[in-house]
């Protein structure tokens, strides 16, 4: 009795395996994949450009660059004065 049940199941499984993947599961063709690469690169470049522009605008509107520039200028002037007094 088990052989009679196992044989139809085996036939169905074998038929499914030999049929291959369904069309929706089939791997895309190489040519279509390679054809989409320039579009994907352009999209990536545009996204990167937008994010970079937003970051630069954010830094321009921030007061951190001005404070940093002032701190470096003040520190440089202090060091310069100390060197002047030390070697004079």
Curated annotation (Swiss-Prot):
Q: What is its main location?
A: secreted
Q: What GO terms are given for molecular function?
A: fatty acid binding; phospholipase inhibitor activity
Superkingdom in the source lineage: Eukaryota
Q: Which Gene3D superfamilies would you find in this protein's record?
A: Apolipoprotein C-I
Q: Which GO terms describe its biological process?
A: lipid transport; lipoprotein metabolic process; negative regulation of cholesterol transport; negative regulation of lipid catabolic process; negative regulation of very-low-density lipoprotein particle clearance; triglyceride metabolic process; very-low-density lipoprotein particle clearance
Where does the protein end up? Secreted
Keywords, ordered alphabetically: Lipid transport, Secreted, Signal, Transport, VLDL
GO cellular component terms given for this protein: high-density lipoprotein particle; very-low-density lipoprotein particle
* Secretion signal, residue range per the UniProt entry: 1-26
Q: Sorted alphabetically, which InterPro entries does this protein's record hold?
A: ApoC-1_sf (IPR043081), ApoC-I (IPR006781)
Q: What does this protein do?
A: Inhibitor of lipoprotein binding to the low density lipoprotein (LDL) receptor, LDL receptor-related protein, and very low density lipoprotein (VLDL) receptor. Associates with high density lipoproteins (HDL) and the triacylglycerol-rich lipoproteins in the plasma and makes up about 10% of the protein of the VLDL and 2% of that of HDL. Appears to interfere directly with fatty acid uptake and is also the major plasma inhibitor of cholesteryl ester transfer protein (CETP). Binds free fatty acids and reduces their intracellular esterification.
Which family is this protein grouped under? Belongs to the apolipoprotein C1 family.
Under what name is this protein listed? Answer: Apolipoprotein C-I
Source organism of the structure:
Phoca vitulina (Harbor seal)
């Amino acid at each position: 009795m088990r052989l009679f049940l196992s044989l139809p199941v085996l036939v169905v499984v074998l038929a499914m395996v030999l049929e291959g993947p369904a069309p929706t599961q089939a791997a895309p063709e190489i040519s279509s994949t390679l054809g989409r690469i320039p579009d994907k690169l352009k999209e990536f470049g545009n996204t990167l450009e937008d994010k970079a522009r937003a970051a630069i605008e954010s830094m321009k509107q921030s007061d951190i660059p001005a404070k940093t520039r002032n701190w470096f200028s003040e520190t440089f002037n202090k060091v310069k004065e100390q060197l002047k007094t030390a070697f004079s």
